[in-house]
Amino acid sequence: AFAETPAPVAGAGIVLQSIGVYCSPEIAGTEAAPDTELGYINLMTAPPEFIFRQTDVPARLGLSFGILIVADRDIANVRVLTWKPGATDPESWTTDIVAGEPKLRGFVFEYENELIPGPWRMEAYDGDTQLYSVTFEVLPGSELPSVTSNCDLLS
């Protein structure tokens, strides 16, 4: 039997605006993030459109998933963590959150070695205070065949 995916948690003043699979975003550039597998994170030109609002995600190349949050205050030096299945340490980086501005925390399956089924947890902390925690259940790529980030196929 599968373990129940934990419900999303949002701290005081944090709204989880969207959770799920989103349209492949336009990448504006990258930002160094040495404590991640790739060593950088992608920066988006604008918040993407979420098309499948769910926490079950198929492990397929090109699929984008994550969350869009809005905070009621500016928060500097937020520690962002991604826990992948079987990892002893999370991938992490720091970012700033601006009051009232939607902030994307996402992941795109770009490489075969990233296609890891199991629970993927996205968290953020302001010091020791948890801002959010959202767990996605990544399923084998053969499952949920209709779920895609290619929005051209959906129009």
Say what each PLM segment does.
Residues 4-119, 123-126, 130-135, 139-155:
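Contiguous segments within soluble domain cores/interaction surfaces
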